[in-house]
């Protein structure tokens, strides 16, 4: 078979990668390396900011570092909304993914230079690059399959496995380079300042993204028919004279795109270099973004003339949005409060050998690989008796709350000295089970309940909940101090919020189910 014929074959005929389209291999490894770069930097970022200057860090307090981390983490999940919009209208998902990867790589390499201007610039570049790559590479995975292709769900499972492989390996490697005393001694022997070990960790993240870009370029012929530039079209007729790669020409959209990019970068940059502004933004950003999202959903729904049932389903999605934000507020303490807890209050030794605190960031990804098939099998076994989406959400919140009760107890034990890392492993176990109950269900609900014309918008709302959760998580980390009583109180408060939210959602779950179930749908059916 010639290359041309291979590229024009129906997607259902392409089974070159473990029974899936060969393009999945290209996207699998690209995402694996991109997540390697993200989780590698994430594992050491908060630690770098709060480590003493004498040992290579910035020497900031948790209160000073938290707003910077919060703004960065929120941007990583907010900017994909803009990146997806740009790709849909101008450059296509394929080009957006490549551009995003290049910007991410440059961001990590910029962080590798031990200067304050490069620190801020690197964070901005990584956030902007992620905005271009994150949503678009997932969209291309979906485009590899025809609508009714039964391999689609399995394909996404393989794709997400790549995410977790990258998430598992990155903290181990980048964390070793950043924190290991033997590596510090080795680079000192090579003539480097041992305090630059943190920047070797950042550079390693950049190398990971670089490897992802190399194999993305090599494998581009495998994704020739997905993620291309949108073609110019009228309401009913496509201009056949338009070139396949010609982007839509709309000066209004271009102006809006430029304004949005400049505004986003300006806000992130100014907030980054002004910690006072970051604090102020924390009290303005969340209400503003939530209100804007609600207004956007309402305006879109009004323009699309939604039915009464559509509005009910949108109400359900906004309820799930609220509880999703609360969940991620707790879950994303992993990179902030829990990371600081691991660094300052945990005895990170195995048989006398001390391992970097950042290594504990690998636990979640490892547990997902182990337990995702088990949780999926439980839902399959229950069949039509499995709990509703709202109840699964409440279970996710409950498990996250239990995790915080565990870490609160562990914090109370630190009055007598450092505690075993197994406490954090147990916390991550509960949080992982909670994530598996909530995250897949939330994403599926957005596509299942949203009106057809609003699916992209509601997927954006889902990522917005993760963005806001990250922001709140970062701000809570600003309260971290190595004091048993203070930490116990903070963790108990978060546990109370999570468990309270779980109970509330469980109580109203019958009402939520009735909102998105029409009389015809009340007949029991096998779950999709």
Residue ranges and their predicted role:
Residues 99-120, 395-416:
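C-terminal ends and interior cores of transmembrane alpha-helices
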Residues 43-66, 179, 334-358:
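Short amphipathic helix-loop junctions that connect adjacent transmembrane helices
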Residues 1-22, 147, 175-337, 344-349, ...:
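Intracellular loop-helix junctions on the cytosolic face of multi-pass helical membrane proteins
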Residues 32, 107, 118-133, 321, ...:
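Hydrophobic core of transmembrane alpha-helices in multi-pass small-molecule transporters
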Residues 66-87, 134, 168-170, 362-375, ...:
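Central cavity-lining transmembrane alpha-helices of secondary-active solute carriers
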Residues 78, 218, 286-298, 353-383, ...:
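Transmembrane alpha-helices of Major Facilitator/SLC transporters
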Residues 89-101, 148-149, 310, 380-398:
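Cytoplasmic membrane-interface "Motif A"-like loop-to-helix N-cap segments
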Residues 76, 153-183, 201-211, 361-368, ...:
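Glycine-rich segments within core transmembrane alpha-helices of 12-TM secondary carriers
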């Amino acid at each position: 078979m010639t290359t041309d014929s291979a590229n024009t074959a129906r997607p259902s005929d392409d089974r070159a990668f473990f029974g899936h389209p060969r393009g999945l291999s290209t996207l699998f490894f690209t995402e694996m390396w991109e997540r390697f770069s993200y989780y590698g930097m994430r594992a050491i970022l908060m630690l770098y900011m709060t480590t003493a200057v004498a040992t290579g860090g910035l020497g900031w307090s948790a209160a000073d570092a938290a707003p910077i981390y919060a703004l960065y983490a929120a941007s990583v999940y907010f900017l994909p909304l803009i990146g997806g919009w740009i790709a849909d209208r101008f450059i296509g998902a394929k080009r957006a993914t490549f551009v995003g990867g290049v910007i991410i790589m440059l961001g990590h390499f910029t962080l590798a230079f031990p200067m304050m201007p490069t620190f801020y610039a690197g964070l901005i570049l990584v956030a902007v690059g992620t905005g271009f790559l994150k949503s678009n590479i997932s969209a291309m995975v979906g485009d590899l399959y025809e609508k009714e292709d039964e391999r689609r769900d399995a394909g996404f499972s393989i794709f997400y496995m790549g995410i977790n492989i990258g998430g598992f390996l990155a903290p181990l490697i980048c964390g070793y380079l950043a924190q290991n005393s033997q590596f510090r001694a080795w680079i000192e022997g090579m003539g480097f300042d041992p305090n630059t070990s943190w920047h070797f960790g950042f550079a390693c993240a950049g190398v990971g993204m670089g490897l992802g870009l190399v194999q993305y370029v090599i494998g581009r012929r495998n994704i020739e028919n997905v993620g291309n530039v949108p073609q110019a079209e009228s309401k009913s007729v496509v201009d056949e004279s338009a070139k396949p790669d010609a982007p839509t020409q709309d000066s209004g959209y271009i102006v809006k795109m430029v304004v949005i990019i400049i505004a986003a970068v300006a806000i992130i940059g100014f907030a980054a270099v002004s910690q006072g502004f970051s604090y102020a933004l924390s009290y303005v950003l969340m209400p503003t973004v939530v209100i804007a999202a609600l207004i956007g959903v309402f305006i879109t729904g009004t323009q699309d003339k939604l039915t009464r049932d559509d509005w009910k389903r949108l109400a359900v999605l906004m309820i799930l949005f609220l509880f999703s934000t609360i969940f991620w507020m707790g879950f994303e303490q992993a990179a902030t409060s829990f990371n600081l807890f691991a660094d300052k209050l945990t005895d990170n030794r195995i048989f006398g050998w001390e391992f970097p605190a950042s290594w504990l960031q690998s636990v979640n990804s490892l547990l997902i690989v182990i337990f995702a098939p088990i949780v999926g099998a439980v839902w399959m076994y229950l069949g039509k008796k499995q709990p509703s989406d709202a109840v699964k959400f409440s279970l996710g919140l409950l498990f996250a709350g239990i995790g915080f009760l565990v870490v609160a107890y562990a914090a109370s034990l630190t009055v007598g000295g450092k505690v075993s890392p197994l406490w954090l492993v147990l916390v991550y176990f509960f949080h992982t089970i909670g994530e598996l109950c909530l995250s897949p269900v939330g994403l599926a609900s957005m596509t299942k309940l949203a009106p057809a014309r609003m699916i992209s918008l509601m997927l954006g709302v889902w990522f917005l909940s993760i963005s806001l959760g990250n922001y709140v998580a970062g701000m809570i980390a600003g309260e971290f101090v190595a004091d048993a009583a203070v930490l116990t109180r903070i963790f108990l408060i978060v546990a109370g919020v999570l468990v309270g939210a779980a109970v509330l959602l469980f109580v109203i779950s019958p009402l939520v189910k009735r909102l998105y179930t029409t009389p015809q749908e009340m007949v029991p059916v096998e779950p999709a």
